[in-house]
Amino acid sequence: MSSLLLNKEIFSKSISIVGLKVNKTLLKTLAQEFKGYLLIRDRVKHIVDDSDSKDKKLVLLSESIENGNVGAYGVNKQLPDNLQSFLKTHSIEVVKHQVQLNYNNFSYEEVMKELIPTGLPIPHAFEKIGHIAHLNLKEELLPYKNMIGQVILDKKGPQIRTVLNKVGKIDTVFRTFNFELLAGDNDLLAQVVYWNSRLQFEHSNLIQTFKSHDIVVDMFAGVGPFAVPASKLVKCKVYANDLNPNSVKYMRENATRNKASTIEISNLDARDFVRELVSRDPPVAFTQAIMNLPSTSIEFLDVFREIFLNPEKAPPIPAPTIHCYTFTPVSETAGGDLKELTIKNVEAIIKHPLPADTTVYEVRDVSPNKRMMRISFKMPTLKKRKDTENNDDQENNNNSSNNNNNNKIDYNEAVSSGGEGKKIKH
């Protein structure tokens, strides 16, 4: 699809402004009195030389103040009475003044309103990582994508040097996105590591629930937005992992720069990472597990089912509290609640009811039909039950099958902080 190019010449124009001829000695006083009524325009001064007098300056008023009774002293019905009185008292002449404008004098909003047809949304929100701005333009804006990119580069700089647009879905194993360059330098270091800056408040919210004695496992740690602050600020012991070697590289750098000294970093598949921790001698008794890969996190819960709901493999450590991020489609909630549906999706993976004190939190709208959710729960476990019947009881029991119950496992007995249930804590 071809894209229209930006023509900056259409913004070259002359506008007529109300000007006040003011003695230089009165400039400071007038500027204070007329605050809120002066010209505000990018790269245009509101005080200019008066071509008719070296002793005076021309003070330019807001574009909303129309020309009125030019040549008179202090007559303009759009000014409040006190300012009109000021003009009369000091015999200040009202004149017309022509101001030449070009593309540089217009704001981002003004340029976009001129370029984008009425009825189409003006793009305001975009992610920024370093010098790179990246957008996710809607289909109806694609014919204007290059113009939009150039305007962002011109009006949101100089810190922005590259503007990208996401193309297609995020479907790579490392959760990076396909993109196209809209404007600026082809300097794309951020293409190999992606951090979603919109979630910085969510990172803080979760980390604040941790205590210094917690042992935290971050299965999809990325560059460390959870792991590094948990180590540096809360002083937790953190085991952080990511499959993407580039993410691991920059996570190590972030940990070093921030003096986060309690992090152990791995570059493994998430399931293998957890298995390795619990297979150590002694096993790592982690208390918190973070799973921040919303598109597939929920599928990786099976590793906790494998470890804590399998009595043959269960390590001698308490079950952790799990914080799992997931996308919940709104369309699937017909006849149900977003939070209830999230709980059902998790229970389908671990094949066990969740505790009653499970909490589900809506993090943000991803799209009109999708929500990002965080579900936090204590991982259920199974408890071995030993029969304590004495020999006399066994002899009096005519059912011989009871003799085989010693040291067997009751698969129906769940041990968890809140018992079985689906109650949601809001």
From Swiss-Prot:
<keyword id="KW-0819">tRNA processing</keyword>
<feature type="binding site">
    <location>
        <begin position="242"/>
        <end position="243"/>
    </location>
    <ligand>
        <name>S-adenosyl-L-methionine</name>
    </ligand>
</feature>
<keyword id="KW-0496">Mitochondrion</keyword>
<feature type="binding site">
    <location>
        <begin position="269"/>
        <end position="270"/>
    </location>
    <ligand>
        <name>S-adenosyl-L-methionine</name>
    </ligand>
</feature>
<dbReference type="GO" id="GO:0005759">
    <property type="term" value="C:mitochondrial matrix"/>
</dbReference>
<dbReference type="InterPro" id="IPR029063">
    <property type="entry name" value="SAM-dependent_MTases_sf"/>
</dbReference>
<dbReference type="GO" id="GO:0070901">
    <property type="term" value="P:mitochondrial tRNA methylation"/>
</dbReference>
<feature type="binding site">
    <location>
        <position position="203"/>
    </location>
    <ligand>
        <name>S-adenosyl-L-methionine</name>
    </ligand>
</feature>
<keyword id="KW-0808">Transferase</keyword>
<dbReference type="GO" id="GO:0002939">
    <property type="term" value="P:tRNA N1-guanine methylation"/>
</dbReference>
<dbReference type="GO" id="GO:0052906">
    <property type="term" value="F:tRNA (guanine(37)-N1)-methyltransferase activity"/>
</dbReference>
<comment type="subunit">
    <text>Monomer.</text>
</comment>
<comment type="similarity">
    <text>Belongs to the class I-like SAM-binding methyltransferase superfamily. TRM5/TYW2 family.</text>
</comment>
<dbReference type="InterPro" id="IPR056744">
    <property type="entry name" value="TRM5/TYW2-like_N"/>
</dbReference>
<dbReference type="InterPro" id="IPR025792">
    <property type="entry name" value="tRNA_Gua_MeTrfase_euk"/>
</dbReference>
<dbReference type="Pfam" id="PF02475">
    <property type="entry name" value="TRM5-TYW2_MTfase"/>
</dbReference>
<dbReference type="GO" id="GO:0005634">
    <property type="term" value="C:nucleus"/>
</dbReference>
<keyword id="KW-0489">Methyltransferase</keyword>
<keyword id="KW-0963">Cytoplasm</keyword>
<protein>
    <recommendedName>
        <fullName>tRNA (guanine(37)-N(1))-methyltransferase</fullName>
        <ecNumber>2.1.1.228</ecNumber>
    </recommendedName>
</protein>
<feature type="binding site">
    <location>
        <position position="292"/>
    </location>
    <ligand>
        <name>S-adenosyl-L-methionine</name>
    </ligand>
</feature>
<dbReference type="Pfam" id="PF25133">
    <property type="entry name" value="TYW2_N_2"/>
</dbReference>
<keyword id="KW-0539">Nucleus</keyword>
<dbReference type="InterPro" id="IPR056743">
    <property type="entry name" value="TRM5-TYW2-like_MTfase"/>
</dbReference>
<dbReference type="InterPro" id="IPR030382">
    <property type="entry name" value="MeTrfase_TRM5/TYW2"/>
</dbReference>
<feature type="compositionally biased region" description="Low complexity">
    <location>
        <begin position="396"/>
        <end position="407"/>
    </location>
</feature>
<feature type="region of interest" description="Disordered">
    <location>
        <begin position="374"/>
        <end position="426"/>
    </location>
</feature>
<keyword id="KW-0949">S-adenosyl-L-methionine</keyword>
<comment type="function">
    <text>Specifically methylates the N1 position of guanosine-37 in various cytoplasmic and mitochondrial tRNAs. Methylation is not dependent on the nature of the nucleoside 5' of the target nucleoside. This is the first step in the biosynthesis of wybutosine (yW), a modified base adjacent to the anticodon of tRNAs and required for accurate decoding.</text>
</comment>
